[in-house]
Amino acid sequence: IRSLNNIGSVFRTADAFLIEKIYLCGITAIPPNKEINKTALGATETVNWKHYKTTLECIDDLKRSGYTICSIEQAERSTMLNDFAVEKDKKYALVFGNEVYGVEQEVINKSDRVIEIPQFGSKHSLNVSVTIGIVCWELVRK
């Protein structure tokens, strides 16, 4: 994620839904950062996080730890979010792409599932922090 405001919003959303940990990858800035703090409102202190040089390295570690990797992207093999069935005995790691390119194809290829938010307008694009809020709410609700 490139926008520092979006990163801060991700921390706030993660705090709201008691997300276990955020994995920041690649060019994504990390706390402490004044611009991140503007939207995080202290959530960088309440949510655990770790930075990885690459998303693929992160995915490999999460898979070794037993996580099901779910990329959130509009892709050929995606399942609509409203049709996605949460299995209570599984641990899920959600992968969100950056604001310009979304989730990289090689990351999608390594994912166990691809989930898409149904959209009806002409843009077929949501801000990444909005996407994270929608997906987290839907999965918690289920």
At which residue positions do the language-model features occur?
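Post-transcriptional modification and biogenesis factors for structured RNAs
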Residues: 1-142
